[in-house]
Amino acid sequence: MEKKVRPARGADKAPLMSFIKEVWGGHDYIPSVWDRWLRDRHGKMFVVEVDGIPVGMNRVRFLGDGSAWFEGARVHPAFRGRGLASMLGENSMRFAAAKGVGVFRLTSGSRNRAAHRQISRILFRETARFSVYEPPRGFRPRPAGAATRMGPGDLLTVMGLLRGAEEFRLGSGVFWHYFAAASLTERVVTGLLAEGAVWRSGDAVAVVKAGDEGEGHWEEVCYIGGPVSDSTGLLKALVGRDKNASERFVFVPQRSPIISALRKEGYGRNFSMVLFERRVANG
């Protein structure tokens, strides 16, 4: 059996989608993003072949904090357990390292123990756990309360509030966008401030952005942290500002006291995930 990893091509779509379309009960997002991923200059897709037949794939995305994000790993059910996912991961690390990247991250569902074992084999370690919450059924956006949009001149204040928040520590200092995690470095926060994506209420800080995939459009609270009362008020002021969003997600690190406040407001957990990381210096 000959196994090989190579860059993805347009012709790989049909054989890969033949099994990917059945993943997650037919709700896998890969079919809706394949064409865009293939064209994306900020990322690279790879395919693993067995005897010349594409049976798996993954993608590397380069993020604004200088890290590489690994996503979209899929292997045909008939070929699992043969080291193909590890081949894809190791190839992605070599590819990213050759471009000077020293930090690699990925995520997996909190209950996907098989994936966690595979991830540990390529020497990634768990750094944080997150849950994603949604407003209650029948939610009607009614933004209210005090929220101040922070600007480029507020960098030092915002960095101080971020670093002092329990959520920053619990969440390994990252924010989420398009379901990828990047470090809230000064450079990244400077960009978010320039976008108008950073908000404050009291000592709480939130990052809010829009996301879209295929025909879907959603609102993301990419980061929320600070005292519970301030954070709750900030969420009341921010969630629902994007009137075009069909879904709204709030990313919160597990063990954050904000979670209890969300539940009291009727928010429900959509899913939970584990953040994994590997650094070049770690081997």
What are these regions (language model features)?
Residues 62-70, 80, 210-221, 269-272:
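A conserved beta-turn-beta hairpin within the catalytic core of GNAT-like acetyltransferases
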Residues 123-215:
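Amide-forming acyltransferase catalytic core, primarily the GNAT-like/NAT-type
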Residues 75, 81-94, 117, 121, ...:
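Conserved acetyl-CoA-binding loop-helix of GNAT-fold acetyltransferases
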Residues 96-110, 118, 243-253:
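Conserved GNAT acetyl-CoA-binding A-motif
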Residues 13, 20-59, 167-198:
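Active-site rim helix/loop that mediates acceptor-substrate recognition in acyltransferases
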Residues 47, 53-61, 69, 74, ...:
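Conserved beta-strand in the GNAT
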Residues 62, 107, 125-139, 268-279:
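Conserved catalytic-core motifs of GNAT/GCN5-like acyltransferases
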Residues 86, 110-128, 254-270:
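Conserved active-site alpha-helix within GNAT-family acetyltransferase domains
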